[in-house]
C-alpha cells in the first residue's frame, strides 16, 4: 500500500473532492495526506475530517486578461514548490494527486520535478490555469465532463465529480443543525466562502415571499443560510426578527444537504454534484465572473434535466422569489428531486481512485 498526497486548496470545490477520494483510498488500505496552503481553508477541513495535513506557501497566478502577476505571489509560489519538494523527498509518496486551484500547484509541480507520478482531477469543461500548467507532465487526468477544452489528447478519463458519499437521516441532520422537523427546509449556500450577492439579496427576498411568520402557500418554511464566515455579522442583524431564518457562517455540508428540501446556490460543479447526490432541487444563481461563464452552462444543464431553475444574477431581485415559490410547491419539488437523483455522481470517487492506483510507482 502507498502514501498518496492530495494537492488541493482554496475553495470547497477543490477541497471536498480531495477529501472524498482520500476516504476511498484509505478504505483500500492506502495512506492519504492533504497538501495545501498553510493557514488556508484546506487546513481547517483536514482537521475536521481527521486527515493529515502538510502546509506550504502558495501564490495566486494571474489568469489571461488579469494583467501581470504580482511578484510577491510568484515568490510565494516558488517558496511553496521548494517546501513541497522537501516534504515529498522525505515522504516518498506513490503519487501526488492535483485537484486544481492555486494551492494545489506547489505540490503538483514539486512532484513533477522529482519524478513522482502525478494524476489530476479537472471538474470543469475547460482546463483551469493550474491544471494547464501541470497537465502536460501528468500521467492522467480524471474529468467530470466527457470533453474538456485544453486537455492534451490521450490524457482524459471520464470519472465524474467525486463527492462525499455520506447521508444522514433527515431527523438527525435537522437536530444537528438546530432546525425543526416539519417545516420545508430551504438551504441558502453561496459556496465555501459565501456569496456577497446572495447575502445582500436573499434575506430581503425571502422575507417578502414568506412574510414575518415564514409561510409558503403549502405550509411553514425554515431557512438555513450559510453566509460564509466573513459575512455573518452583516446578515445576522437583518434577519434577527425572523425566528424561522437561521444564518450561520459555516455549516456541516453533509448535514445541510441531508436536511434540505430545496436550495438556493451558485452553480459550481461541486455544489451541483452534492445536490444531485442528495436529491435536492436547486434554484441556481450562476457566478457571472466564472471562467468562460462555466457556471451558467452548468446551471442550464441542471435546468434542462429538470432538477432546478436558473436565475441570472442581474435578475436576482425580480425573479428569485417566483422561482423559489415555484420550486417549493410539493409536486414540482418531487419531480425535481427525482430528476436530481438521476444526475447523482455515485461512484466517482471510486472510479478516480482506480485511476490513481493505476499510476502509483
Swiss-Prot record:
Gene Ontology cellular-component terms listed: plasma membrane
Keywords, comma-separated and alphabetical: Cell cycle, Cell division, Cell membrane, Cell shape, Cell wall biogenesis/degradation, Glycosyltransferase, Membrane, Peptidoglycan synthesis, Transferase
InterPro entries assigned to the protein according to its UniProt record, in alphabetical order: GlcNAc_MurG (IPR006009), Glyco_trans_28_C (IPR007235), GlycoTrans_28_N (IPR004276)
Gene Ontology annotations of biological process type: carbohydrate metabolic process; cell division; cell wall organization; lipid glycosylation; peptidoglycan biosynthetic process; regulation of cell shape
Known catalytic reactions: di-trans,octa-cis-undecaprenyl diphospho-N-acetyl-alpha-D-muramoyl-L-alanyl-D-glutamyl-meso-2,6-diaminopimeloyl-D-alanyl-D-alanine + UDP-N-acetyl-alpha-D-glucosamine = di-trans,octa-cis-undecaprenyl diphospho-[N-acetyl-alpha-D-glucosaminyl-(1->4)]-N-acetyl-alpha-D-muramoyl-L-alanyl-D-glutamyl-meso-2,6-diaminopimeloyl-D-alanyl-D-alanine + UDP + H(+)
Binding site for UDP-N-acetyl-alpha-D-glucosamine: 11-13, 124, 164, 192, 295
EC number: 2.4.1.227
Top-level lineage group: Bacteria
A Pfam entry, by short name: Glyco_transf_28
Topology of this chain in the membrane: Peripheral membrane protein
Keyword Hydrolase: no
Membrane spanning residue stretches: none
Biological pathway: Cell wall biogenesis; peptidoglycan biosynthesis
Subcellular location, record wording: Cell membrane
PANTHER family: GLYCOSYLTRANSFERASE (PTHR21015:SF22), UDP-N-ACETYLGLUCOSAMINE--N-ACETYLMURAMYL-(PENTAPEPTIDE) PYROPHOSPHORYL-UNDECAPRENOL N-ACETYLGLUCOSAMINE TRANSFERASE 1 (PTHR21015)
Similarity comment text for this entry: Belongs to the glycosyltransferase 28 family. MurG subfamily.
Function of the protein: Cell wall formation. Catalyzes the transfer of a GlcNAc subunit on undecaprenyl-pyrophosphoryl-MurNAc-pentapeptide (lipid intermediate I) to form undecaprenyl-pyrophosphoryl-MurNAc-(pentapeptide)GlcNAc (lipid intermediate II).
Protein name: UDP-N-acetylglucosamine--N-acetylmuramyl-(pentapeptide) pyrophosphoryl-undecaprenol N-acetylglucosamine transferase
Primary gene name: murG
